[in-house]
């Protein structure tokens, strides 16, 4: 569910409390249908960026899997914010995709800052909680499709086992593939 200010729910509506009544109706419906709740909370500093509220939500629905998009969307030089967010959302039912990290950090290929964000996320959460994602075609304005995976595939910061979990095993687990 895209709730961001840019192109999501809050781009066209007033601020919606992610832990409010209206959203709980959506979460409950998703849980009742056995869905994985994928949520993009937008960028830091926007009214849609409600990590505190989301932490309460994931605790209220422990049987439902959540995937938080963009690793909570850290921008350039926001490692401390990333660490805080990951610790706050570190629950058994919460996973993270890493789509658009290179775009968010605005660094040139091989996107070393994005690599360091993924490395830190694995250190905090473990290798089983992070899913690769590209955010294509939207990310085409920043990098090629090959670069969107090669920056991690070719990185020396990750073991082969970690890469297999990131690119393959975790998605199978989360989405029951």
PLM regions with names:
Residues 3, 41, 71, 135-136:
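Active-site metal-binding loops of divalent metal-dependent hydrolases
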């Amino acid at each position: 569910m895209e709730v961001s200010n840019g192109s999501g729910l809050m781009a066209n509506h007033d601020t919606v409390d992610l832990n409010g009544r209206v959203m709980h109706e959506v979460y409950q419906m998703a849980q009742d249908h056995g869905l994985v709740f994928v949520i993009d909370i937008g960028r830091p500093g926007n009214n849609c960026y409600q990590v505190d509220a989301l932490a309460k939500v994931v605790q209220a629905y422990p049987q439902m899997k959540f995937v938080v998009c963009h690793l909570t969307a850290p921008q350039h030089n926001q490692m401390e914010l990333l660490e805080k967010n990951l610790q706050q959302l570190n629950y058994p039912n919460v996973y993270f995709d890493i789509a658009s990290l290179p775009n968010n950090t605005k660094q040139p290929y091989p996107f070393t800052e994005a690599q360091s964000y993924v490395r830190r996320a694995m250190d905090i959460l473990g290798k089983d909680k992070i899913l690769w994602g590209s955010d294509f075609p939207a990310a085409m304005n920043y990098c090629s499709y090959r670069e969107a995976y090669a920056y991690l595939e070719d990185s020396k910061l990750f073991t082969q086992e970690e890469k297999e979990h990131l690119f393959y095993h975790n998605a199978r687990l989360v989405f029951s593939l």
